[in-house]
């Protein structure tokens, strides 16, 4: 679970709803002082939310980019159905296309972890809205065996327990890491996340096929693979190989693990804006 440094957005960002042809999505919309030189659409990972990108928003706007971080359907402040079918990857990818359409300008697409696999699916449906694609800590196929087991344990618990009961069980087994975030914010996010969404997307993470060759064939589209120097969800050598197969730029953020966006935000933002500036 990503732990943002705060749930309070910086002054450059406004919390609002993005209205699309597929419904309303809660977003943090950060804008630079002048005319943006580009717009970025940010997709969070499994159990995450738009707040996972909070520490990147100010550096992005300072570099001249508008950034729109979104809660996907069933994530935190975006409502979603109670049926697992509503969270099929094709549905979530279609949501991304609708979000890009509503933003109204071509976007640099970035997905973290699960968000990267949804971003990939969106590009494979229709690459036309996207200027570039960044996959952050998001691998070529299913997650590692250890993570598959963790996802199964969580999904089994969600079938028989309430979200509050699961939260308390997780905290008992895995106390929160030291963080400036008030644990109440993390709990509030968890309780507002759809259990159906977690079960459906968790399953996707455990069975996702390797679609790297399909993605590599999408040209011209600059691609960027970003990760920390350690990752137990998709091992770093696997991400290295994926980047090579994609012909993508590769960035390893020193001192970061599965969430460079929260572990080392300044270094991560610098690598991203350099890529978007044209340093492909």
Language-model regions: role of each:
Residues 1-40, 62-65, 131, 173, ...:
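Alpha/beta-hydrolase fold catalytic core
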Residues 9-10, 20-21, 62, 68-110, ...:
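Active-site loop/oxyanion-hole signature of alpha/beta-hydrolase fold enzymes
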Residues 120-125, 129-161:
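Flexible "cap/lid" loop of the alpha/beta hydrolase fold
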Residues 196, 200-243, 252:
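Conserved serine/cysteine hydrolase catalytic core
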